UniProtKB/Swiss-Prot annotation:
The gene is rkpK. NCBIfam families: NDP-sugDHase. The active site is at C265 (nucleophile). Transmembrane segments: none annotated. One of its GO terms (biological process) is capsule polysaccharide biosynthetic process. The keyword NAD applies. This is UDP-glucose 6-dehydrogenase. Keywords: Capsule biogenesis/degradation, NAD, Oxidoreductase. Substrate binds at E151, F152, L153, R154, E155, K209, N213, F254, L255, H256, A257, G258, G262, K326.
Length: 437
């Protein structure tokens, strides 16, 4: 099938290249001429394991192309996916849908023959209705069906998630079966591998995405609050998480205590769901609390580091390892590291950071951050070493080397990737999350 992907950002690029790898002819469209030029040269604007190889192989096969010419791409398409950004609207937390609606107008003006227009971006309930209204207002003669098909990709594992999904949710309204047939064909390689296609209404599909992300965010926030309680009563949050996670009704995923959730999805999607519910006079109190607790969590982690370092860090050097919101990505959006570093700086410390992939973005987002080339350069003459993001390369640190270069051998482990006895034998003081120290 001929597919156009509007938006060559994270979701659009990963989805487009995976569709091409399925054998479809895919054109990724973006208004950013610099981005398109770079992609044509094989320069990938984001870090995602395996993405560069997959782009190169599908470009070489002729199945994947990049352009800023939306008109030509849309006119030749069977399916057009809208995968543009939906950031939180400045000031009120609602999702900013201006890019989605602008894309809908441009798509409408260039449709030729029957076309399925799909919202792949995460959008509030009812957005598909407005996209359809815009298309029909712009081009009353258009033979089009608007479909919702939310993405469920985890940054750092997006290709695996796309090719081996737990489910594929497709929201289709009306009695015209053509869109259902088209979407089944688009996902045929996965359907043949028995990945379940969940067909539902458009509005239900849109809500599934928000409800799923909100539930996972609540699960993270729950275990973080349990971790705080563990510290007060002398319990171990990792054992608590294992003990409840083995219950099949609960499951073990997203029960890892830490500095709070961040990234491009959970913060904005929980906030957007809260606003949608308030607009319909049906507040979601659990999600409201999740948002508030998580915001405070990030700042509290800064205070935890300060307390571990003796309560006064004025003039101290603090080294932080891991700046992205999670491992295996260069995404700094709403990363807990931002709030932690700012809290340390506000308390008078000089902060030096290292991240395997996030340094370029960190420089843009964290003013006054000193940047190191590796963990040991970051730790030189440091009064404390803080692990914020659990990159694999931080799981086997040379503590003897660290001790020889640090001013004070103190490790504050905000991801619980070490045990106290492991680091104490090297002469380090150790603080972690939700465990007896």
């Amino acid at each position: 099938m001929k597919i156009t992907m509007i938006g060559a950002g994270y979701v659009g690029l990963v989805s487009g290249v995976c569709f091409a790898d399925f054998g479809h002819d895919v054109v990724c469209v973006d208004k950013d001429e610099g981005k398109i030029s770079a992609l044509k040269k094989g320069q990938i604007p984001i870090f995602e394991p395996g993405l560069d190889h997959l782009v190169a192989s599908n470009v070489a096969s002729g199945r994947l192309n990049f352009t800023d010419d939306l008109k030509t791409a849309v006119a030749a398409s069977d399916v057009v996916f809208i995968a543009v950004g939906t950031p939180s609207r400045r000031g009120d937390g609602h999702a900013d849908l201006s890019y989605v609606y602008a894309a809908a107008r441009e798509i409408a003006a260039n449709l030729q023959g029957f076309t399925v227009v799909v919202t792949k971006s995460t959008v509030p309930v009812g957005t598909g209705d407005e996209v359809e209204r815009i298309i029909r207002e712009t081009n009353p003669a258009a033979d089009v069906t608007v479909v919702s098909n939310p993405e469920f990709l985890r940054e750092g594992a997006a290709i695996e998630d796309f090719k081996r999904p737990d489910r594929i949710v497709i929201g289709v309204d009306g009695s015209d079966g053509r869109a259902r047939e088209v979407m089944t064909e688009v996902y045929r390689p996965l359907y043949l591998n028995q990945s379940p296609l969940v067909f539902t209404t458009r509005r239900t599909s849109e809500l599934i995405k928000y409800a799923g992300n909100a539930f996972l965010a609540m699960k993270i926030t729950f275990i973080n609050e349990i971790a705080d309680l563990c510290e007060k009563v002398g319990a171990n949050v990792q054992d608590v998480a294992r003990g409840i996670g083995l219950d099949g009704r609960i499951g073990s995923k997203f029960l890892h205590a830490g500095p709070g959730y961040g990234g491009s999805c959970f913060p904005k999607d929980t906030l957007a769901l809260v606003k949608t519910a308030q607009d319909h006079d049906t507040p979601v109190r659990l999600v409201e609390t999740t948002v508030a607790v998580n915001d405070n969590r990030k700042r509290a982690m800064g205070r935890k580091v300060i307390a571990a370092a003796g309560g006064d860090i004025r003039g101290s050097k603090i080294a932080v390892l891991g700046l992205t919101f999670k491992p295996n990505t260069d995404d700094m959006r709403d990363s807990p590291a931002i709030a932690v570093v700012q809290a340390l700086q506000d308390a008078g410390a000089r902060v030096t950071g290292y991240d395997p992939e996030g340094m370029e973005n960190a420089r843009k987002l964290i003013e006054g951050l000193d940047c190191a080339r590796d963990p040991y350069e970051a730790a030189a003459e440091a009064d404390a070493l803080v692990i914020i993001t659990e990159w694999n390369e931080f799981r086997a640190l040379d503590f003897d080397r660290l001790k020889s270069t640090m001013k004070t051998p103190l490790l504050v482990d905000l991801r619980n990737i070490y045990r106290k006895d492991e680091v104490a034998k090297h002469g380090f003081r150790y603080a972690s999350i939700g465990r007896p120290d």
